[in-house]
A protein has these predicted regions:
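Charged, low-complexity intrinsically disordered terminal segments
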Residues: 28-272
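Bacterial Sec-dependent N-terminal signal peptides
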Residues: 1-34
Length: 272
């Protein structure tokens, strides 16, 4: 979910984008992990703003000088996302509740396979329950074929008997991070009905956000935390967290990212 709030300051308006991530198994984060990234002290915002004070008290990170572009439809999202993927040089990370096995997913996977051939690292993660509950799920044969093409793809928290394990703690995140510099987050999974709509409801209305700037590092850290726990890998390092100068997006937007960690941060989610 995305919450846009504005807080008035003496010298003008100060905008915040608060991104709320839901999902995960009960004890996935029994201990806090650090991937290889923490913002410099200069990222701390000093203000008498009630919003900023709350975020600080709740230990919710806020970064400055970000560029934000609101994507108000499925077509806008996928056009923008695919265009950025084509320009990727080092890595593409995707985390979704589900990848519906339809035309838009096929287009995405074809593009990702092409980038893998160019040497770009491709990592994709989806929720096992989200895939199982999908009317057009990815099957083992699909995953095997994607891996042959150089796409690392795994499902989070596989379903086990009696098939309701952690049913209320699923991974509902929708995150894409490209080269550690551009990120996408919002309400849309990978499915063609975000563009075509559905017969029973008509046009599908949802939104997504493209982010450039230091906030992408937090989304990268969130992705790599669950990726490393799921795959037992240890992906980290400066290649995934490129350094931004303090003037990259001068006078850009400030972004607060709230990540739901079960048994650790549910209070943050409720209050935010």
């Amino acid at each position: 979910r995305i919450i846009l709030t504005a807080d008035y300051l003496k010298k003008g308006f100060f905008f915040f984008l608060t991104i709320i991530m839901f999902g995960f198994v009960n004890n996935l984060y029994a201990q806090q992990d650090t991937i290889f990234f923490h913002s410099k002290p200069s990222d701390t915002i000093t203000s008498d703003s009630a919003v900023i004070q709350f975020l600080s008290d709740a230990d919710i990170p806020v970064t400055t000088d970000n560029k934000i572009h609101l994507l108000k439809s499925g077509k806008e999202k996928f056009d923008d996302l695919f265009s950025t993927i084509k320009k990727a040089k080092h890595h593409i990370h995707l985390e979704y509740f589900n990848f519906r096995n339809d035309s838009i997913a096929n287009e995405l996977f074809t593009l990702l396979a092409h980038k893998a051939q160019e040497g770009v690292e491709i990592r994709a993660l989806f929720d096992a329950f989200g895939n199982w509950s999908n009317s057009r799920p990815l099957k083992k044969k699909h995953l095997k074929n994607l891996r042959k093409k150089g796409i690392e793809i795994y499902h989070f928290d596989p379903l086990r008997f009696p098939y309701i394990n952690h049913v209320f703690h699923r991974d509902h995140r929708k995150i894409v991070v490209i080269d550690g510099t551009i990120a996408y987050v919002g309400g849309m999974n990978i499915a063609d009905y975000y563009i075509k709509g559905l017969p029973e409801i008509g046009e599908w209305r949802d939104m997504h956000v493209r982010i450039e700037g230091k906030a992408t590092h937090y989304l990268q850290e969130i992705f790599l935390s669950i990726w490393n726990k799921t795959t037992k890998q240890n992906i980290s390092g400066t290649a995934y967290f490129p350094i931004y100068s303090d003037t990259t997006f001068h006078k850009g937007k400030s972004i607060a990212i709230v990540d739901r960690t079960p048994k650790k941060t549910p209070k943050q989610i409720r209050q935010t």
